[in-house]
Amino acid sequence: MFVRFYKRLDRQYIQSQRRWILSSNKCLLQGNKNATISPLRRAFDDQDHWEESQAQNTSSEQDNKGKNSSYFWSRSKATAPQVAHTGLFQNPYLNSPEGLRKFANKSLTEATALVRNLREDSSQEGLVRYIIRLDQLSDILCRVIDLCEFLRAAHPDEQFVAAAQECHEQMFEIMNILNTDVVLCKRLKQVLSDENISSKLSSEEIRVGHILLEDFEKAGAYASPEVRKQFIQLSQNISIIGQDFINNTESLSSSYIKIPCKDLESSGTSHLVLRQLTKDTMGNNYKIPTSGYAPYTLLNACPSEAIRRQVWTAMFSCSEKQVKRLKSLLQLRRKLANIMGATDYVSYQLEGKMAKSPENVKNFLNTLVDHTKPLAAGELEELAKLKRNVENLSETNTLKLMRPWDRDYYSSLSPNFTRPNHRVDGFTSINTYFSLGVVMQGISDLFRDIYGISLKPVVAQAGETWAPDVRKLQVISETEGIIGLIYCDLLERPGKTTSPSHFTVCCSRQIYPEENDFSTIQVGENPDGSRFQMPVISLICNFRATRHGKNKSLCLLELSDVETLFHEMGHALHSMLGRTQLQNLSGTRCVTDFVELPSILMEHFAKDRRVLLRISSNYATGEPIPEELLSAFQEQNNFLKNTETFSQIKMSMLDQRLHSITDQDDIIAVYHGLEREMEVLVDDQTNWCGRFGHLFGYGASYYSYLMDRAIAAKIWDHLFKKDPFSRSSGEKFKEGVLKWGGSRDAWQCIADALDEPRLVKGDDWAMRFIGEVEDM
């Protein structure tokens, strides 16, 4: 209850800061004297300039201690005292692992004092402000727990990561203790039931109050002391084992496998491929690594199905220890659900969600299966024909014939489905038109067109970021000024999470007159003079930068990378525009099966030809991408599209089943049984479910991704398909969905966006309506 966080994320003190002086506000592109490069693009594409500006900013801070800090490309207002070396996110505590511990202890002291006030202040004014104070308590805890969640995933210093884990466990336990606090729960119920008090509350306060009351009850606040104690311990254990599970999802059962040289050499595999492989010391076997480039090359190039199956199985299998972690996680969750009176964790978790019940989720997924399975089978038929011909097989059932280790090999043989290897005849590589800076500028331009906001780069203070290649962006509204901050950690680096992620570091909320300590937050100002806690988020990706021409390094994106970046920026957009009075409902703090909607809608923009043509720019010439080249790549990107969607359906069903079974010892059998039941590219060879990391973060709610894909497809068709740059459509989506965060019923938001009032009920008809979508 007190902490609601999602990855999927000192006052901004009003001060005059001198602009970093550039020789020109726009700089010439390499190789094209007539083209110009925007400051935002240059921040990501000109590594030398970035390093120079970082160094100059640090030097300026050291030379001007106590004076205004040096930002470049944009001004921001502030009145904070300047220091030569701040901490992460301008929090002065966060300059060392020990500083993080001090910040956690400071927050714990503040939380303890606030809890005492909540328990003791029974005055009329105290009761009227009770929900606001509960929200402030939640904010104190969130700003430690969410921060630590981020640091564990991204900070390069192992000591910082260890401190983050320690502080996370400490504050998470406090949160669970508060979740079961009987006194706090009863007083909240009193506030909501007393009309003399509730009549003085805003609609947002009442909604937060009801949500918090439901969370109290879900945590067992009315249960016996023994049950509450069990809830606290189980929740703590789930958090710890879940983090351990996440940390090991990339660990394979073995780092390599051995294949006899005679088998591989007689398989028909190209000698060019074989020359890239190493042999064991005796020279009798090839040592095939289970990660990296080599195994994928064999899946594409080896004619032997037996060898492909062996390689594929090794690539997607985890250790027995990892399977045990998953079993423990599932057992703990089932026990927690049972002591709370639920039959299983699925039923427990779906309370309060859009889907409402396991039966509704099941019906939704079955609707998708009925629509998608025939389409997936049709896509695989072309590959099945090739397999029949190559191996002289008589099997006519495509789904029985095609296995997951066949897909890449027969795709490489098919003239109709072969993916281009970065090039189309007569053209340069497609990624040369989508440098990281070009795409970031394109996203900013799109946001400006449809939402009236844009992105501006600023140089962070020394110590404000955790790695030298992190870029800091201000989010600027046409009407409100600076509304939020995004820290972009987009380039690959050892030790950081491999999953693209949006981390909320600090939620937006209203600042109250009695608050005067802004040393650990950044504060924004509304047009009416009121102040708000600046939303701060971090975006994590692992794009690769390489040397290109005169550039020290340049990051060029494939179309799939462009979609990834648009997706994560969709989460960021939600965090920036969903600035509610109370942080409990700010931005992405909405129900789980609604949170992916803004990000998946952004994927539609990333796939739209009109958008891509507008934002593209060759990094060397400045020319837009040729439409013929873009069309060719987009056609190839639709390769096995429905088959990929069906794999998401299978994962959603697996999540539901694993969280509803009574015997967790049979999880591999459950996985294999579901694969055989679903029939499409059946995997009955691996224990891949142990590598399915979303079973922790999206436990019993992984269906949310598909549900939001279906909703996003309908919203795209209704609002943006005709004109993706429409300001009126953007305003409708912003006013109907984005600005509310979680402060409005999700079905009401969707009903308004789609102009379909019947959806407000969120009943069986609504679920079927969402599930009946032609193109996800």
From Swiss-Prot:
The gene is OCT1. Its main location: mitochondrion. This is Mitochondrial intermediate peptidase. Belongs to the peptidase M3 family. Zn(2+) binds at H567, H571, H574. Residues 1-28 form a transit peptide. Residues 48-71 are annotated as: Disordered. It is an enzyme of class 3 (hydrolase). The active site is at E568. Its EC number is 3.4.24.59. Cleaves proteins, imported into the mitochondrion, to their mature size. While most mitochondrial precursor proteins are processed to the mature form in one step by mitochondrial processing peptidase (MPP), the sequential cleavage by MIP of an octapeptide after initial processing by MPP is a required step for a subgroup of nuclear-encoded precursor proteins destined for the matrix or the inner membrane. Coiled coil: none annotated. Binds 1 zinc ion.
